[in-house]
A protein has these predicted regions:
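Polar low-complexity intrinsically disordered regions
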Residues: 1-2, 147
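C-terminal motif of bacterial Sec signal peptides marking the signal peptidase cleavage site
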Residues: 19-22
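Bacterial signal peptide processing site
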Residues: 24-27
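Bacterial N-terminal signal peptides that target proteins for export
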Residues: 2-10
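Alpha-helical transmembrane segments
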Residues: 13-17
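First exposed extracellular module after export/assembly in secreted or surface-exposed proteins
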Residues: 32-174
Length: 174
């Protein structure tokens, strides 16, 4: 029995789809992570006061060695876990520097908002990663119409430092 025209069309679409997906090249990115600023928004409570900021960055990494396991797991290189304080530059791998506008002068804030990115390496032979990271940045209670911006970079497990991105300015009302 001959195939109907619609059946032929579906067969051609399926064969073409499988042929192109089989030929798809794996993602390739440089081994040094690269980031780009996506956005920063204030998350408000029911009274319209900022509770925290949510910043989003995009990233790529060619070998996918982004993020750490929890320190309690014992699966990280010890250099990423100990000491778990400011003397260890690699304890956190999502680095944030805060700038506060005070009397029309941008001043570096001493509060460290850096954090740990969780382990993100994919399974399989192609480890290249592309994605977004969202991070909540706490804000001080009582700030009214204060202006900030942030500089952010990340480290991968090979200690490659990404480029640094600057967020847009944001006015906080907490």
């Amino acid at each position: 029995m001959p195939m109907k025209p619609i059946g032929k069309l579906i067969a051609v679409i399926l064969i073409t789809t499988f042929a192109f997906s089989a030929c798809k090249k794996p993602l390739e990115y440089p081994l040094i992570p690269s980031i780009d600023f996506k956005n920063i928004v204030g998350v408000k409570d029911a009274n319209g006061k900022d509770q925290y900021l949510q910043v989003t960055i995009g990233f790529t990494d060619g070998d996918g060695d982004i993020g750490y396991f929890s320190p309690e797991s014992g699966l990280n290189d010890p250099m990423f876990d100990y000491p778990a304080d400011a003397t260890n530059p690699y304890y956190t791998n999502f680095k944030v520097k805060t700038y506060h506008l005070i009397n029309n002068v941008w001043t570096v804030d001493t509060v460290d908002l850096s954090a740990r990115i969780p382990y993100l390496t994919p399974l399989g032979s192609n480890k290249a990663l592309k994605g977004e990271i969202q991070r909540e940045l706490p804000i001080d209670v009582g700030l009214v119409n204060d202006t900030f911006y942030y500089e952010i970079f990340i480290y991968d497990r090979s200690l490659h430092q990404s480029n640094t991105v600057k967020t847009s300015n944001i006015v906080i009302n907490s």
